[in-house]
Amino acid sequence: MLKRTSKQLSMFSSLEDMLSHQHPLFQLSNKINWECFENAFSPLYCSTNGRPAHPIRLMCGLLILKHLRNVSDEMVVSQWSENAYYQYFCGGLEFMPKQPCDASELVHFRNRIGEEGMELILAESIRVNTDHDDEDHFDTAFIDSTVQEKNITYPTDAKLHKKIIKNVLKIVHDKSLPLRQSYTRTLKGIYRSQRFRNHPKNRKKALKADRQLRTIAGRLVRELERNLEGKKGYENMFELYYKVLSQNRKSKNKVYSLHEPDVVCISKGKEHKQYEFGNKVSILRSWSGLILGACSFRNEYDGHTIEKTLEQTQRMTGRKVDKLSGDRGYRGIKQIGQTKILIPDTPKTKDSYYQKRKKHKLFCKRAGIEPTIGHLKADHRLSRNFYKGVKGDAINVLLAAAAYNFKRAMRVLLYLIKRISIELVSTGFMLKYSF
């Protein structure tokens, strides 16, 4: 059930009067159309029963601030109680020296609005940057793919087998099931033998310990399956465990994590990081540096990600991209609908000098999407995804792209404020009357 939000100002102090109207976060909060979030997400709540929920603007604002400031759920809730600009951004009318909600409520809100709600936030971030703007952001765009790494440890068979044994023993202990042997003392020796496996003298011993660990894990799983009555609620768990125990080096569609079984292994040819474990994301950036699309995939060929990314951009903005430039990883596709796909290639003999220079400039400009991806990873939480499952993969990349666009709008607003102030001061107009 939605809680009624009061717009009654405080009799003694107003949060708006306390703050500087020149602050970029203050300016951004007045430029975002919060009513579109209210209208879109209100039907997701029950209007007749249940505890009154927190305001939609508060929850949306916290999600935006989290990726804008690159902090966790717990940290953004804690900072909200200390920062007056955060509270005004989330619709506060007076300063509240306490946390607005529990950090876990952000998890429920993300699951409630889903991927469609995140696309609405990204669409609003695009509108904030393009509203009343004469520049054509949809004439030429650039596309590139990167890996969004999942929050898992580096996967090895031994680590997975250890976790299987630990989980099985926990279920046996919680349900007081009979167990012929727990292998407690045996496992200590096996773990010791697996240490320092890279030393030439320990290699053979470590490989033998790996085989013993797999055997013990299989025994415990089979014994648990026999002792559990009906296996109700554990079917998926046993299926996952047997898949992990049966996979080898040449297996297809491997499981790299027990709590994130959808993670895939991607090799992008990097010297410092040969393999990355997560999922592939596609980023579409305009000529002016605005992110127009952000889609999540498994490990598809780059050329097969273009169509879905263009559809998302058209769905959010109602506009079509005329020309799309990508690197040589997108070879094989020349046109999708009305959008021409431009890939770097050997210059044609029939091209004039002007055409060659124009293409060269376009492909040089395409490289500008690389630092954009770098900022998404370093500043907006794209480098490591902490959200759960395939749904969390899509949510994280959409929120990171939206935060990037909102930060761009804040820089533009700050630049305009400084420029107007300098011009007014140069003409002799006092700065305190400027705003």
Regions found by a protein language model. Give the residues of each.
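Active-site- or DNA-interface-adjacent structural scaffold in DNA-acting proteins
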Residues: 93-262
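Short, conserved catalytic/metal-binding motifs centered on acidic residues
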Residues: 23, 60-62, 76-77, 102-106, ...
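Flexible, glycine/threonine-enriched loop-and-boundary segments that flank and lead into catalytic domains
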Residues: 258-273
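Charged, often Cys/His-bearing segments associated with DNA-binding zinc-finger transcription factors
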Residues: 1-32, 411-435
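Basic, low-complexity intrinsically disordered segments
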Residues: 40, 45-52, 59-60, 67-134
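Helix-centered, glycine/charged polyanion-binding patches within enzymatic domains
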Residues: 322-391
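Acidic, metal-coordinating catalytic cores used for nucleic-acid/nucleotide bond scission
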Residues: 49-54, 84, 325-333
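Electropositive, glycine- and tryptophan-enriched low-complexity nucleic-acid-binding patches
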Residues: 270-316
